[in-house]
Regions:
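Glycan-processing catalytic domains of CAZymes
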Residues: 1-214
C-alpha cells in the first residue's frame, strides 16, 4: 500500500491509499473547499482526536460531496495513471464517530468513490470499519477489505464473512493478542496476513518489522 504520489512496486499487487473521509495533512481545504469540512458549534473544523492534523470531511449534502470529489478525484486519477492495481479508501466510519455526519451522505460518497475507481480500471477496498463490512461488500460494492488489527480486536470474521478470501489483514507488533504464529494458525485469519511495526518503517531502518503468514 502506497500513497497516490508514489510509484508502484514492480511485480507486486499495488494498492494506492486515499484518505476519502478525512483530510490529508497539509492538504488545502481553504476557501470554498472549507464548506466540506465538519465544523463544531463555533464553526471550527473538527479534527480527529487520534490524528489531530487530519480534519473530518462532511459528505452529508450533495454540494459537500461534489466539493470532496473535486479535491479527491485527482488523487484517484494519479493512482490509475501511475499503474496501481487498486485503491483503498480510509475512514469510511466517520459517520459512526461523528453523529453530525449523515449516514446516507457517507454511503453516497462511498458509492461515488467505487464508481470512479471501477471506471478507471481499479479495484477498490474498504479500510477497517468491521461493522460496515456486510454493507461495504453487499450493498456498496467494495471489491476487498483491508483490516488493521482484526485479530487484536476479535473482528476477523466480520471481514472474512462478507469478503471471503479478499481480505488483507495487518497486525502490529505492539498490539499482538498472541504470538504471531498463533495469529497465523487462527481459523478466521485472512489468507494474506502480515505483521508490521506501527510506524511502517522501511527495510533496514531501526524498528522495522515485516512478517507474513505462510
Amino acid at each position: 500500500m502506497r500513497d497516490s504520489t508514489a510509484q508502484p512496486l514492480a511485480g507486486a499487487y499495488n494498492i494506492c491509499y486515499l484518505n476519502g473521509f478525512q483530510t490529508q495533512p497539509g492538504a488545502d481545504w481553504s476557501g470554498d473547499r472549507g464548506s466540506a469540512l465538519l465544523r463544531d458549534e463555533s464553526g471550527t473544523p473538527v479534527a480527529d482526536a487520534d490524528w489531530p492534523d487530519e480534519y473530518i470531511l462532511d459528505p452529508s449534502t450533495p454540494s459537500q460531496r461534489t466539493t470532496i470529489l473535486q479535491v479527491l478525484t485527482p488523487g484517484l486519477n494519479r493512482c490509475a495513471a501511475n499503474g496501481f492495481d487498486a485503491v483503498e479508501i480510509d475512514n469510511l466510519d466517520t459517520f459512526t464517530r461523528f453523529p453530525a455526519i449523515e449516514r446516507a451522505g457517507a454511503m453516497e460518497l462511498a458509492r461515488s468513490y467505487i464508481a470512479l475507481a471501477h471506471g478507471r480500471g481499479l479495484a477498490i477496498g474498504q479500510k477497517n470499519a468491521a461493522e460496515l463490512a456486510g454493507i461495504g461488500r453487499g450493498q456498496l460494492g467494495f471489491d476487498f477489505a483491508v483490516t488493521e488489527e482484526c485479530a487484536a480486536y476479535d473482528e476477523c470474521n466480520a471481514y472474512t464473512g462478507p469478503y471471503g478470501p479478499h481480505v488483507l489483514q495487518i497486525e502490529y507488533v505492539d498490539n499482538l493478542p498472541a504470538p504471531f504464529a498463533a495469529v497465523c494458525a487462527a481459523p478466521d485469519r485472512a489468507p494474506l496476513t502480515i505483521l508490521r511495526d506501527r510506524d511502517l518503517t522501511p527495510p533496514g531502518a531501526a524498528g522495522h518489522v515485516y512478517q507474513q503468514c505462510p
